[in-house]
Protein backbone atom coordinates (compact mmCIF):
# COMPACT_ATOMS: atom_id res chain seq x y z
CA UNK A 1 0.00 0.00 0.00
CA UNK A 2 1.39 3.40 -1.03
CA UNK A 3 0.48 5.60 1.90
CA UNK A 4 -0.17 9.26 1.17
CA UNK A 5 1.35 11.63 3.70
CA UNK A 6 0.21 15.04 4.92
CA UNK A 7 1.67 18.03 3.11
CA UNK A 8 5.09 18.94 4.44
CA UNK A 9 6.05 15.35 5.25
CA UNK A 10 7.14 14.34 1.73
CA UNK A 11 10.81 14.62 0.74
CA UNK A 12 11.28 17.92 -1.07
CA UNK A 13 14.32 18.38 -3.31
CA UNK A 14 15.89 21.79 -3.94
CA UNK A 15 14.30 21.73 -7.38
CA UNK A 16 13.02 19.45 -10.10
CA UNK A 17 14.39 18.92 -13.59
CA UNK A 18 12.08 18.85 -16.59
CA UNK A 19 12.80 15.10 -16.80
CA UNK A 20 11.66 14.68 -13.18
CA UNK A 21 8.39 16.42 -14.02
CA UNK A 22 7.82 14.42 -17.23
CA UNK A 23 8.45 11.14 -15.38
CA UNK A 24 6.12 12.18 -12.54
CA UNK A 25 3.43 13.04 -15.11
CA UNK A 26 3.78 9.63 -16.79
CA UNK A 27 3.74 7.74 -13.48
CA UNK A 28 1.07 9.99 -11.88
CA UNK A 29 3.48 10.48 -9.01
CA UNK A 30 2.80 12.93 -6.18
CA UNK A 31 5.44 15.63 -5.83
CA UNK A 32 5.86 18.38 -3.27
CA UNK A 33 7.24 21.93 -3.51
CA UNK A 34 6.61 25.31 -1.93
CA UNK A 35 3.79 27.56 -3.06
CA UNK A 36 5.46 30.95 -3.52
CA UNK A 37 2.61 33.17 -4.66
CA UNK A 38 -1.15 33.37 -5.14
CA UNK A 39 -2.06 35.69 -8.00
CA UNK A 40 -5.17 37.87 -8.46
CA UNK A 41 -7.02 34.93 -10.09
CA UNK A 42 -6.15 32.71 -7.11
CA UNK A 43 -3.78 30.54 -9.12
CA UNK A 44 -0.92 29.17 -7.01
CA UNK A 45 2.63 29.61 -8.29
CA UNK A 46 5.00 26.83 -7.28
CA UNK A 47 8.81 26.84 -6.98
CA UNK A 48 9.98 23.95 -9.17
CA UNK A 49 13.55 24.94 -10.05
CA UNK A 50 13.61 24.13 -13.77
CA UNK A 51 10.53 26.08 -14.83
CA UNK A 52 7.53 27.99 -13.57
CA UNK A 53 4.77 25.90 -12.06
CA UNK A 54 1.14 26.99 -11.83
CA UNK A 55 -1.81 25.38 -10.12
CA UNK A 56 -4.97 26.93 -11.62
CA UNK A 57 -7.59 27.95 -9.03
CA UNK A 58 -9.88 25.06 -10.06
CA UNK A 59 -7.04 22.61 -9.33
CA UNK A 60 -5.80 24.24 -6.11
CA UNK A 61 -8.14 22.47 -3.68
CA UNK A 62 -10.91 19.86 -3.59
CA UNK A 63 -14.33 21.48 -3.57
CA UNK A 64 -13.23 24.94 -4.67
CA UNK A 65 -15.45 25.00 -7.78
CA UNK A 66 -18.52 23.65 -5.98
CA UNK A 67 -18.19 26.16 -3.15
CA UNK A 68 -17.56 23.55 -0.42
CA UNK A 69 -14.04 24.96 -0.02
CA UNK A 70 -13.35 28.68 0.37
CA UNK A 71 -10.57 30.64 -1.33
CA UNK A 72 -8.74 31.00 1.99
CA UNK A 73 -7.79 27.33 1.53
CA UNK A 74 -5.74 28.46 -1.48
CA UNK A 75 -4.38 31.72 -0.05
CA UNK A 76 -3.21 30.03 3.15
CA UNK A 77 -0.92 27.68 1.23
CA UNK A 78 1.51 30.43 0.17
CA UNK A 79 4.92 29.90 1.77
CA UNK A 80 4.12 26.28 2.59
CA UNK A 81 4.85 22.95 0.95
CA UNK A 82 2.03 21.57 -1.16
CA UNK A 83 1.48 18.24 -2.88
CA UNK A 84 0.57 18.10 -6.56
CA UNK A 85 0.56 16.05 -9.73
CA UNK A 86 1.86 17.25 -13.10
CA UNK A 87 -0.97 17.63 -15.64
CA UNK A 88 1.13 18.88 -18.55
CA UNK A 89 3.02 21.86 -19.90
CA UNK A 90 1.83 25.14 -21.42
CA UNK A 91 3.36 26.26 -24.76
CA UNK A 92 5.69 28.64 -22.87
CA UNK A 93 7.07 25.71 -20.82
CA UNK A 94 5.15 26.45 -17.62
CA UNK A 95 4.28 23.24 -15.76
CA UNK A 96 0.54 22.89 -15.17
CA UNK A 97 -0.06 21.23 -11.80
CA UNK A 98 -3.01 19.92 -9.78
CA UNK A 99 -3.23 19.81 -6.00
CA UNK A 100 -6.87 18.68 -6.25
CA UNK A 101 -5.89 15.46 -8.07
CA UNK A 102 -3.34 14.64 -5.35
CA UNK A 103 -6.02 15.18 -2.69
CA UNK A 104 -8.50 13.00 -4.61
CA UNK A 105 -5.91 10.23 -4.99
CA UNK A 106 -5.23 10.29 -1.24
CA UNK A 107 -8.94 10.14 -0.37
CA UNK A 108 -9.57 7.37 -2.90
CA UNK A 109 -6.88 5.25 -1.30
CA UNK A 110 -8.20 5.93 2.19
CA UNK A 111 -11.74 4.91 1.18
CA UNK A 112 -10.49 1.85 -0.73
CA UNK A 113 -7.84 0.48 1.63
CA UNK A 114 -8.63 1.72 5.12
CA UNK A 115 -11.32 0.82 7.64
CA UNK A 116 -12.54 2.37 10.90
CA UNK A 117 -9.90 1.62 13.51
CA UNK A 118 -6.95 2.12 11.16
CA UNK A 119 -4.33 4.67 12.21
CA UNK A 120 -3.16 7.46 9.89
CA UNK A 121 -0.44 10.09 10.24
CA UNK A 122 -1.98 13.57 10.36
CA UNK A 123 -1.14 17.23 10.76
CA UNK A 124 -3.56 19.68 12.40
CA UNK A 125 -4.46 22.36 9.83
CA UNK A 126 -7.25 24.27 11.54
CA UNK A 127 -9.13 24.62 14.81
CA UNK A 128 -12.84 25.36 15.19
CA UNK A 129 -15.16 25.31 18.22
CA UNK A 130 -16.46 21.88 17.13
CA UNK A 131 -13.11 20.18 16.43
CA UNK A 132 -9.85 20.13 14.52
CA UNK A 133 -9.30 19.73 10.81
CA UNK A 134 -6.40 17.43 9.99
CA UNK A 135 -4.45 16.86 6.79
CA UNK A 136 -4.61 13.07 6.34
CA UNK A 137 -2.86 12.98 2.97
CA UNK A 138 -1.84 15.54 0.33
CA UNK A 139 -3.95 18.25 1.93
CA UNK A 140 -7.14 16.17 2.09
CA UNK A 141 -8.97 16.88 5.36
CA UNK A 142 -10.47 14.73 8.05
CA UNK A 143 -12.42 16.07 11.04
CA UNK A 144 -11.32 15.30 14.57
CA UNK A 145 -14.48 16.21 16.52
CA UNK A 146 -14.21 17.91 19.90
CA UNK A 147 -15.79 14.93 21.72
CA UNK A 148 -13.25 12.58 20.11
CA UNK A 149 -10.12 14.41 21.24
CA UNK A 150 -9.77 12.89 24.69
CA UNK A 151 -11.69 11.31 27.53
CA UNK A 152 -11.85 14.64 29.43
CA UNK A 153 -14.18 17.48 28.58
CA UNK A 154 -12.63 20.25 26.52
CA UNK A 155 -14.16 23.61 25.65
CA UNK A 156 -12.04 24.07 22.52
CA UNK A 157 -9.62 21.84 20.58
CA UNK A 158 -6.94 24.49 21.18
CA UNK A 159 -6.87 23.26 24.80
CA UNK A 160 -5.09 20.14 23.54
CA UNK A 161 -3.89 20.75 19.96
CA UNK A 162 -2.13 23.42 17.92
CA UNK A 163 -2.06 24.09 14.17
CA UNK A 164 0.94 22.35 12.61
CA UNK A 165 1.04 19.60 15.23
CA UNK A 166 1.79 16.13 13.89
CA UNK A 167 -0.10 13.26 15.46
CA UNK A 168 -1.42 9.78 14.75
CA UNK A 169 -5.20 9.65 14.39
CA UNK A 170 -7.61 6.75 14.29
CA UNK A 171 -10.31 6.55 11.63
CA UNK A 172 -13.68 6.63 13.39
CA UNK A 173 -15.86 6.47 10.27
CA UNK A 174 -15.66 6.74 6.49
CA UNK A 175 -18.36 8.27 4.29
CA UNK A 176 -17.27 7.83 0.65
CA UNK A 177 -20.55 9.23 -0.72
CA UNK A 178 -20.01 12.55 1.09
CA UNK A 179 -16.19 12.30 0.83
CA UNK A 180 -15.80 12.64 4.60
CA UNK A 181 -13.46 11.04 7.10
CA UNK A 182 -14.21 11.29 10.83
CA UNK A 183 -11.23 10.90 13.15
CA UNK A 184 -10.68 10.20 16.83
CA UNK A 185 -7.82 10.31 19.34
CA UNK A 186 -9.60 8.82 22.36
CA UNK A 187 -8.77 5.21 21.58
CA UNK A 188 -5.06 6.04 21.22
CA UNK A 189 -4.77 7.71 24.62
CA UNK A 190 -5.22 4.74 26.93
CA UNK A 191 -7.47 4.22 29.93
CA UNK A 192 -8.33 6.66 32.74
CA UNK A 193 -5.89 4.83 35.00
CA UNK A 194 -3.06 5.01 32.44
CA UNK A 195 -3.66 8.72 31.82
CA UNK A 196 -3.86 9.54 35.55
CA UNK A 197 -0.53 7.83 36.30
Say what each PLM segment does.
Residues 1-197:
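Single-stranded RNA-binding regions, centering on S1/OB-family and related RNA-binding modules
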Amino acid sequence: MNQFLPEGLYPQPEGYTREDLLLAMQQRKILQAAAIKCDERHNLHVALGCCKGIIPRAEAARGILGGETRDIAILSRVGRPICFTVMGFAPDGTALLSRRSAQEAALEQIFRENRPGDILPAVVTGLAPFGAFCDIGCGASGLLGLRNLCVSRLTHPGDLLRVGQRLPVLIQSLDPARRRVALTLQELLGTWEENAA
